């Protein structure tokens, strides 16, 4: 439930020790948080909340928070550090050490963020707030199970500050 999420869960001094753990990648519903929902022709919120595009459900929207601590060395701080999310349904905010880094929506496309400027030597806190529905959920309504969470791999890439990138 969005209303029950602590506003400051991503802050450095917020204590997350009492939180449940969940595997990443996985879906909340498969792990017992919420109910899996199959949808074919009807939007999952039809009859439960009266909304029109481009707005996302609010009353029935769910959210989940993830926290991960990583250690960064002095040598790594002298490089470019990227974090990659290969799949998150349906949208999310990324925080590093209490600062918002960015936002992404598109469940099935990868998202990459440069977190270099947010890191410190030693322990770093990464926070991710994932929402079950967003305005892009109107476009993702297909014949499939609607599940939420970080359902594909997440990884760090550490590169030299000057490097070659392939693009098309």
Language-model segments: which ranges?
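Surface-exposed, low-complexity/disordered Ser/Thr/Gly/Pro/Asn-rich loops and linkers
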Residues: 31, 35-58
């Amino acid at each position: 439930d969005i209303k029950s999420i602590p506003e400051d869960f991503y802050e450095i001094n917020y204590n997350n020790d009492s939180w449940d753990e969940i595997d990443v990648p996985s879906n909340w519903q498969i792990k017992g948080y919420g109910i899996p929902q199959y949808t074919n022709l009807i939007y999952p919120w039809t009859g439960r909340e009266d909304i029109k595009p481009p707005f996302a459900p609010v009353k029935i929207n769910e959210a989940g928070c993830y926290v991960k601590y990583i250690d960064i060395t002095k040598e790594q701080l002298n490089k470019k550090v990227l974090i990659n999310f290969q799949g998150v349904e349906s949208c999310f905010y990324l925080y590093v050490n209490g600062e918002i880094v960015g936002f992404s929506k598109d469940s099935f496309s990868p998202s990459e963020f440069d977190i270099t400027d947010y890191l410190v030597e030693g322990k770093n806190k990464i926070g991710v707030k994932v929402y079950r529905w967003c305005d892009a959920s109107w476009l993702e309504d297909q014949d499939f199970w609607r599940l939420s969470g970080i359902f594909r791999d997440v990884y760090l890439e550490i590169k030299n500050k000057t490097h070659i990138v392939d693009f098309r």
